[in-house]
Amino acid sequence: MKPNAVKAFSLAVVLLAGPICSRAVTILSGPSFTRATNAPLAGVLQLATDVETRVSVSVSDGTNVWQRRFYDYATTHSVPLLGFKPNRTNEITVTVYDRYQNPVTAAQPLVFITNPLPSNFPNIVLLQSQPDRMEPGYTLFNVMMKNSTYWYVAIVDSSGEVVWYNGAPSTADVRRLDNGDLFMPWTTNFVEMNLLGQIVNSWVVPTNLPINLHDGVPTSHGTILYLSDAVMVVSNYPTSMTNPVAPRATAKVRYQNVVEISATNAAVLHTWTPINFLDPLRISYLIVNSLGSWDSEHSNAVIEDPSDDSLIVSMCMQNAVIKFSRATGQLRWILGPPANWGPAWQPYLLTPVGTPFVWQYGQHAPILTPQGTLILFDNGNYRASPFAPILSVTNYYSRAVEYSINEKTMQVSQVWDYGTTNAAQRLYVDHEGNAEPEPLTGNVLTDFAAVSYVNGVAPSSFGPTATMTRITEVTHDALPQIVFDLAISLYANTNTSYKDCETYRSHRIPDLYAHPAQPVADLSVTLEYGPPFLQFSADDTRTYVIQASTNLVDWEAIGAALEDEQQSGDFSFADVGAEALPVRYYRVLTQ
């Protein structure tokens, strides 16, 4: 549950005096491949060898050829194979290498035939893709259809092709853990699922603190944050969101607690009740009476701000994002339109400065960026607060927006947005969505989760309730450039009369596999030609620093290993400064 921080793993090796020899490797059993029961595009490769080996596979699916190299040495291998595409005949060629890089290839390739996607799977159409400008990796999302009566967790590549899916029973967010598994909320528990579709962990919450499916957040310190619904009775509650002189009455108001549990044993560690320091009588045009109570907050996200040990919560029905102290529950600020906040909350309202500036309405999924700004998905519901006039729904728009908050001056400025006049199309999403800043490119991946209007018109002849999804990646420029655009819908699906389709959030994941920092397992040093020559195989997503010593106590970094241009994962380093030394020790630090 903890993030995969950069770690230094090392292996010390004494200089060798000559070439390395070894006998041939023998494959004792296998290889065999077994399709995963709950992940139709994945499976497990198994084989055994007489000496410790690592595995490499080459897959030809009739259209493309791709490779995967694994760097764990063992005599018995059980390796998940991921990344197959539907409706393909895959030939899997298996090669094993011993610690001296001697290869043996299995006599015959394995054959894995993948089925077509299910008949009720949504239609995915790639509208644009520029892989050289995109954030590297794959796009993960949970797509819901038929009024949320069935759904699929799916992963697509940069060409929009499905490379993994599972009919997971969760209607909300799904996110990738650092170990490569998926984390998602159910109504009674959180689950961790690997990409073979197996549930490998579960956290059951107390019955009096049920999970609100909008969010579940594994933290860096071994806990899980989530939202939990509760109801309180208040007096003098407005009975109309549109009539300022309507009578007031005693009413039930629904709100969300913020709960923190242990990732070790699911024990409750903390509970916060934001409605206690907010105004339970404040209204917006979004608030509705449902399930026997007024949906006052509809909190949909909680995140940590580690800079001052505080929590940030998005309350879409309040058109507000709030920040409060984790330790004391003290309110820090309120981001959102100031209408209908009483005198007690005026000191906490952020004041907008600079132009352009537009408040967010019905927002989802705030994220703190490395620059300290706050980016979120602004749904844009109504674009007004009671009792001001509202626009026609055909004029609404949704966007990704980034704000900079100065807590000393209690001011907020708009840094960047995408989806207003700087977008090719004006999309409106009345619920769900997220905007995710990407770490390598700075691009922003935006999930227009449930599009009901495009340029003020329903996206299809089925009307605005037949929503579709647009997942768009744009550059973080004043005039953003689209580098990836994916449309997901049920419009062309004749197997269902329902045509609504939505994705709660989308995420760019760097790979289908995790890449933890691991020690190099096959470092060799030879003196046959010239200076000491170091060689090893390792994960090419990492960098490897060579350190040297003459006494195994004092170590000095002497350079970084270089990857072979022809063979990914093969690294080498020539120590040209070692010739005058009587003895030299080496170790490799994985970063």
Identify the residue ranges that each predicted region occupies.
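Short beta-strand segments within Ig-like beta-sandwich modules, predominantly Fibronectin type-III
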Residues: R68-A74, L562-Q567
